[in-house]
Regions:
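Fold-independent oxyanion-binding glycine-rich loops
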Residues: 8, 31-32, 86-88, 109-112, ...
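A glycine/threonine-rich phosphate-anchoring loop and its flanking beta-alpha core
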Residues: 102-196
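Active-site nucleophile and cofactor-binding loops and adjacent substrate-binding regions
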Residues: 60, 86-88, 239-243
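A short, small-residue-rich loop immediately preceding and capping a beta-strand
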Residues: 75-98, 102-113
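ATP/NTP phosphate-donor binding region
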Residues: 1-81
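Predominant activation on well-ordered alpha-helical scaffold segments within soluble catalytic domains
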Residues: 15, 43, 69-72, 164-175, ...
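Active-site segments that bind and position negatively charged phosphate/pyrophosphate groups
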Residues: 184-243
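Short glycine/serine/threonine-rich phosphate/pyrophosphate-binding segments
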Residues: 11-12, 35-39, 65, 90-97, ...
Length: 243
């Protein structure tokens, strides 16, 4: 499972996280708006360290083979020890998929929380016309940095979409595993799926109200954790051929 750090000061732990992997060179890839939101905090955290940012790259607008190839073919991404992916699902999935070929460690910075891509070992790949091509199966991100302030200041519709996505996780997993005879890992996933719904009912309405006001609060943090971490862990535990 991915390690994660949550809080408005989450990027202060970035140097130590990179040091755990012996990483001194990084490439930062994301959407244009995502980089505008996350880059100041990342750069401030890396200032006066021995970590070198080789490149900051706008990935494109969709997780297509063409955009994935641009990351794969980037000399900076090839040289980097860690790829730091910033954005929503499409940006994160682009970097996660590119990392398969590059054999790189990925850190994720979800700047919206419309889904659990920041934590999962699966990625969606689209055709150039926006239709679904299929899926890739990267390693799960090594570390997630969740900044509730960035998420609260993103458009509220993404937060609302994430609530819906997380709300579907428990019944989805219950149905997929209803035949029983679960392996231990899938059983863990089913148990964890039962933790996904309660935070949404407890904090969802309040969290959405605060996001509409661009305010970072405990409710926003709890919903972001549920959408990204709880459901992401469930996905990784139950993403098996039989389910």
């Amino acid at each position: 499972m991915s390690d994660y750090t949550v809080g408005e000061d989450c990027f202060t732990e970035l140097p130590a996280a990179l040091a755990e992997y012996g990483a001194t060179k990084v490439a930062i890839i994301g959407g244009k708006r995502a980089l505008a939101a996350a880059l100041p905090g990342i750069e401030a955290a890396l200032e006066d360290t021995d970590v070198e940012v080789l490149e900051t790259r706008v990935y494109g607008t969709n997780s297509t083979r063409a955009n994935i190839a641009k990351v794969v073919n980037s000399p900076a991404c090839q040289e980097a020890d860690v790829l730091i992916a910033c954005g929503g699902g499409k940006a994160l999935d682009t970097v996660k998929t590119a990392a398969i070929e590059l054999k790189k460690i990925v850190f994720t910075v979800p700047t919206i929380c419309s889904n659990c891509s920041a934590a999962t070992a699966i990625a969606v790949v689209y055709n150039d016309d926006g239709s679904l091509e299929g899926y890739s199966y990267p390693n799960r991100p090594a570390r997630i940095f969740i900044n509730p302030k960035i998420i609260a200041e993103a458009p509220a519709e993404y937060f609302w979409a994430g609530v819906g996505d997380a709300l579907s996780k428990q019944p989805e997993v219950e149905y997929a595993t209803s035949a029983g005879n679960l392996e231990h890992t899938a059983g863990l996933g089913l148990a964890l799926a039962h933790t996904c719904s309660e935070p949404l009912f407890t904090y969802g309405v309040q969290g959405l109200e605060y996001v509409r006001l661009d305010l970072s609060t405990e409710a926003v943090k709890q919903i972001a954790l549920d959408i990204v971490v709880n459901t992401g862990y469930v996905s990784n535990l139950t993403n098996q051929n039989d389910y």
